[in-house]
């Protein structure tokens, strides 16, 4: 499980899929929904342009395989797609009389045929916009699911002079990021401030952790305590290259100033790229920071603790999951299993309430140490699987802030006929107590938010020790 366009691209590559469908007669809708797509068969070929046939395949793939595909009102997806199509026509100044939504009856196949006929009449009149209209239409259909683990991944390109480990963007991270920007923006809280400077334009401009961002391109990041869309401009994705103007405040000096940052490729600190980092606190506490549930990450955490345990008696473990965007639920389960056996860590449920049970891997050796887990709104997906299990099963204490609430369910991938990837969950996630975590998050046992002053000094706020 993962969230954001970059994360989506990583998920698509990790979970390569294959999906095929025969070309149906134009007078009929697609074959039965269940035959629209299939599970992975191999890596994708070269991507080609999206077409109405690709949109059709995705539509029936969703109806046949998505969590609520069998019960949802498919008209809502077609409506979302048509809204996006007409808005794009307006943006290009090319609106046409025929761009009216056809009548829909609730018959999924008949409705698709009506939609397709209207779509073709429109796009035949603006052939130079055909590719763009297909993209916005399919993006809107997928977004119409309202599911933070449903996405269509396409047009993923590396910028020139980009190498593994490099970054692209403005070169800094703020306290509102990742899942809060893309998956659950209602969770963001003011003030907006820099938490890490990674390189690039931000480093060249002299930004520092703790600097408060008062405006972005002239727009405030919060209105009446609610996040505004302006925050998304802090995280451009290639090929987005428009400069971003920030108004900043450094509280330690009272200085206010403005900078303009241009997105670009930058080298990142190699240490910051490590998935697992560890150190000893107070001569007896193992501190381990885990940035994502990558393959083999649980074993790497165990090895880090074992190294710190050599030659001394540990009194506890602090596992820092702040900013952990998720990854493999298998790794999350293995990590939980080092703190408890014979437990249910989660349920994965279909729309009719039939649930599969996720249990601890009792082949994992118990650490036998008290546990404190540091969480924040950047802890998403598999990170929330782990955190909810720790809290519900009383395996340790959560300290920090509530998690992201971006954990609808583990996504399954499908490769569409133009070699782009469609991903969404077939089941939705519930915590060990059968509670919904998605859009809500996991509350901490001790609420200890990070402040601009904490970020500026590089010190964590006081939190309970194991």
Segments and roles (model prediction):
Residues 20-22:
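Bacterial signal peptide processing site
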Residues 26-53:
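N-terminal low-complexity, Pro/Thr/Ser-rich intrinsically disordered segments
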């Amino acid at each position: 499980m993962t969230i954001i366009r970059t994360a989506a691209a990583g998920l698509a590559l990790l979970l390569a899929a294959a999906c095929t469908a025969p070309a149906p007669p134009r007078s009929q809708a697609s074959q039965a929904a269940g035959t629209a797509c299939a599970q992975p068969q191999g890596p994708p070929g070269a991507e080609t342009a999206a077409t109405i046939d690709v949109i059709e395949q995705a539509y029936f793939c969703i109806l046949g395989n998505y969590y609520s595909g069998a019960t949802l009102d498919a008209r809502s997806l077609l409506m979302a797609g048509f809204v996006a199509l007409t808005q794009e026509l307006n943006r290009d100044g090319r609106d046409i009389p025929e761009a009216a939504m056809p009548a829909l009856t609730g018959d999924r196949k008949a409705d698709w045929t009506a939609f397709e006929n209207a779509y073709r009449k429109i796009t035949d009149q603006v052939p130079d916009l055909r590719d763009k209209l297909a993209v916005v239409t399919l993006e809107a259909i997928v977004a119409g699911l309202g599911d933070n683990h449903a996405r269509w991944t396409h047009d993923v390109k590396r910028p020139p002079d980009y190498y593994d480990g490099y970054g692209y963007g403005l070169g800094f991270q703020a306290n509102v990021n990742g899942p809060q920007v893309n998956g659950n923006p209602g969770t963001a809280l003011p003030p907006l401030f820099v938490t890490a400077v990674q390189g690039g334009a931000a480093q060249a401009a002299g930004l520092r952790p703790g600097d408060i961002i008062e405006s972005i391109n002239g727009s405030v990041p919060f209105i009446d305590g609610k996040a505004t869309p302006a925050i998304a401009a802090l995280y451009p994705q290639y090929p987005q290259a428009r400069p971003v103007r920030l108004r900043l405040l450094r509280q330690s000096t009272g200085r206010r100033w403005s900078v303009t940052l241009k997105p670009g490729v930058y080298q990142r600190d190699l240490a910051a790229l490590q998935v697992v980092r560890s150190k000893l606190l107070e001569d007896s506490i193992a501190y381990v920071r885990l940035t994502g549930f990558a393959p083999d990450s649980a074993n790497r955490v165990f090895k880090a603790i074992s190294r710190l345990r050599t030659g001394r008696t540990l009194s506890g473990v602090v596992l820092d999951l702040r900013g952990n965007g998720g990854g493999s639920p298998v790794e999350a389960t293995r990590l939980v299993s080092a703190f408890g056996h014979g437990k249910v860590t989660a349920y994965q449920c279909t729309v009719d309430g039939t649930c599969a049970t996720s249990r601890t891997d009792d082949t994992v050796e118990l650490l036998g140490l008290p546990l404190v887990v540091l969480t924040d709104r950047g802890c998403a997906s598999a990170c929330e699987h782990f955190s909810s299990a720790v809290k519900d099963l009383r395996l340790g204490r959560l300290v920090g802030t509530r998690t992201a609430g971006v954990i609808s369910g583990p996504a399954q991938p499908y490769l569409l006929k133009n070699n782009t990837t469609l991903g969404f969950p077939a089941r939705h996630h519930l915590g060990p107590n059968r509670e919904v975590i998605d859009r809500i998050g996991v509350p901490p046992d001790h609420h200890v938010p990070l402040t601009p002053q904490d970020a500026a000094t590089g010190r964590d706020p006081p939190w309970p020790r194991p």
